[in-house]
């Protein structure tokens, strides 16, 4: 038995080894290096000095750090809510076959396969405050133009809208798979018992979707905290995050401190704090899985 087990390991190991090596090179080693840099004053070159917790203390005393964290939290909450709601709504309309349903699914999913850089550039031109398409249309019908990406109160909302538009199709496909896995006889039995559509949704659909819903929310939360590309592209590259820091999420603040200000040690400390926040939220979600997720609906 032991000999057979060793043979299986020898058979599987060559296939797992490349992936394991890549994981170590591109994930484990960078994380370890970032944690190490967080305790130094490294600013490039070969000179560095161990500073203990100074970078972390500086971060917790920094107004920019907490503002970035607040902007990140706002972005994350809105994108999670709207992506899940819109994705679930579209899935409920499209999971049953009807004439042309595959066309509608494809149209709604296409934005997700586009490059976020291309999407960001396109919408930056569309919402350009001076000569953008949207403002041109508003002026043509006698309405006042909006600042959009140049407005402190509107810039983040535009970026949230673009994020939701590009990504809700992915969640839709995820929910369609979950809906199709629910036993249709449960709905038939519920109808016989006199249950209406709303009661069926809360008694069968939502519990049956809870494993997929839990996974979708977890992924959406992690993506929300990690956002960088839309901010970088749509607000002015390395000098972006404006206006007045209204779109400067924590990941973008980390980028600026590292690659614009060359404060690699401090940026690493911010990155470690962000990693701890994401891990903590994920652990809380996983801990609550027993309460929120139902595996009884088949």
Regions found by a protein language model. Name each.
Residues 4-298:
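A structural signal for multi-pass alpha-helical bundles of membrane permease subunits
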